[in-house]
Every structure is written in C-alpha cells, then in structure tokens.
Amino acid sequence: MKKGTKVIVQRDETKHPSKGTWPMFRGRKGVVTCEVRGAGPVEYGVSFSGGDSADAYFKRYELTERK
C-alpha cells in the first residue's frame, strides 16, 4: 500500500474481535500517509482529515482500499 492510497478502516471481527478504541475508527474513510516498518508487522499511518500527518495507525488486515 502506497502513500496517497484511499482506504476504509474495516476488518474481519470474527478473527479480530472489537475492543478498546477500535469502534471509534470502524468504517471511517481516510488516506495512507506513511508506512512504519519495525520488528513487528508493518503499520500504515492514516489521515482522516486529509493532511500529511497520521491520525491513527493500522495493520494491513484492518484496511481496505477504496476507489
């Protein structure tokens, strides 16, 4: 997933049950602003306001590309 990709925040909640702050982001539309690689899985920064800074970070299985 590249910077600028339009995404919807959604995931399979049978595999990954909803808890914590997840319900606040479910179904929101945003744009990928960055990719964070480290020791764990890759996370993507998503901006919901259209800016260049990330409002929240999600794993790949939590995002779906939109057209």
UniProtKB/Swiss-Prot annotation:
<protein>
    <recommendedName>
        <fullName>Gene 51 protein</fullName>
    </recommendedName>
</protein>
